[in-house]
């Protein structure tokens, strides 16, 4: 069973960051060690919340505690997501180095959350710059959405070919694998939700139906997507197998959420279909 140190946000009510990804990852058979960068009452797209950003030293101290009991060598991957500050990011890279010193086979999966002010997702100053300058070259796998891909590659991405090229430019700087979590306007069809999974040698495209939630889209979809992909890859799935399972599993969560007329992702209700999706979507090699 794989062990994943997941360093990202936590909400007490609802699902975002670790609160979205932790349970689905466990449902696929991974041990998740959740380490929270922030603890908020709820996710920020409600427009108001309470809570705090964890001091960067808190992250390092917790991981040192795990090292002190001799367990860090059993960590197979570090996953990072929403950061409360750029300084937290610097400490996370120190943690990645510490984990890799204990287990040289461990991977670093970076979900470079950079914020979408128009959607109510706010990140602290310097976080985007941290991802571009430091997290990108340190990562083994990175999972930007379209906007984040453009920021990381420093140019516009207007179609699928552009996205593959931009992903390969990122690979040249460090990562082995790039997941483009949402192609949006750069995809083949505005009627579908599309993703890319790219390495230096391969590029896989997949699409599924959009699920219409109106103006109030659920939060945490990207967090679940990143977490599930990491689990599948650690378990030995091929790029194609991992992409197909994750796409179907996330779709099952979206369908359950829509059916129950909820705003928060219904990961518990969809748990059996996360492990064994009823839908299937085929990935195409480009």
Swiss-Prot record:
Function: Pyridoxal kinase involved in the salvage pathway of pyridoxal 5'-phosphate (PLP). Catalyzes the phosphorylation of pyridoxal to PLP.
Annotated organism of origin: Salmonella paratyphi A (strain ATCC 9150 / SARB42)
Pathway: Cofactor metabolism; pyridoxal 5'-phosphate salvage; pyridoxal 5'-phosphate from pyridoxal: step 1/1
GO BP term (any one): pyridoxal 5'-phosphate salvage
Coiled coil start-end: none
UniProt similarity note: Belongs to the pyridoxine kinase family. PdxY subfamily.
Positions with a binding annotation for substrate: 9, 44-45, 223
Pfam families, per database record: Phos_pyr_kin
EC number: 2.7.1.35
A GO term from the CC aspect: cytosol
Quaternary data: Homodimer.
Kinase among keywords: yes
Protein residues bound to ATP: 111, 143, 148, 181, 208-211
GO molecular function: ATP binding; magnesium ion binding; pyridoxal kinase activity
Lipid metabolism as UniProt keyword: no
Protein origin, superkingdom: Bacteria
Keywords of the record: ATP-binding, Kinase, Magnesium, Nucleotide-binding, Transferase
NCBIfam families: PRK05756.1, pyridox_kin
Protein name per its UniProtKB record: Pyridoxal kinase PdxY
Enzymatic class: transferase
Catalytic activity: pyridoxal + ATP = pyridoxal 5'-phosphate + ADP + H(+)
Cofactor(s) this protein cannot do without: Mg(2+)
């Amino acid at each position: 069973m794989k062990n994943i140190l997941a360093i990202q946000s936590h909400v007490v009510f609802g699902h975002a960051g670790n609160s979205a990804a932790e349970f689905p990852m466990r449902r696929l058979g991974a041990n998740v060690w959740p380490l929270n960068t922030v603890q908020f009452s709820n996710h920020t797209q409600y427009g108001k919340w309470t809570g705090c950003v964890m001091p960067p030293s808190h992250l390092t101290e917790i991981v040192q505690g795990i090292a002190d009991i001799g367990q860090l060598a059993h960590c197979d991957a570090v996953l990072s997501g929403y950061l409360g500050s750029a300084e937290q990011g610097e400490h996370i890279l120190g943690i990645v180095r510490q984990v890799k010193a204990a287990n040289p086979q461990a991977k670093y999966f970076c979900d470079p959350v950079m914020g979408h002010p128009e959607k109510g997702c706010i990140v602290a100053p310097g976080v985007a710059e941290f991802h571009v300058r430091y997290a990108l070259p340190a990562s083994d796998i990175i999972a930007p959405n379209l906007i984040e891909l453009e920021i990381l590659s420093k140019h516009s991405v207007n179609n699928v070919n552009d996205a593959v090229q931009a992903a390969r430019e990122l690979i040249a700087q460090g990562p082995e694998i790039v997941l483009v979590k949402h192609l949006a306007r750069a995809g083949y069809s505005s009627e579908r939700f599309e993703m890319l999974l790219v390495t230096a040698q391969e590029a896989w495209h997949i699409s599924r139906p959009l699920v219409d939630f109106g103006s109030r889209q659920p939060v945490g979809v990207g967090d679940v997507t990143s977490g599930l992909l990491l689990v599948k890859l650690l378990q030995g799935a091929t790029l194609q197998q991992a992409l197909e399972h994750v796409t179907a599993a996330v779709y099952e969560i979206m369908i359950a959420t829509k059916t129950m007329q909820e705003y928060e992702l219904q990961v518990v209700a969809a748990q059996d279909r996360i492990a064994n999706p009823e839908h299937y979507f085929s990935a195409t090699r480009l």
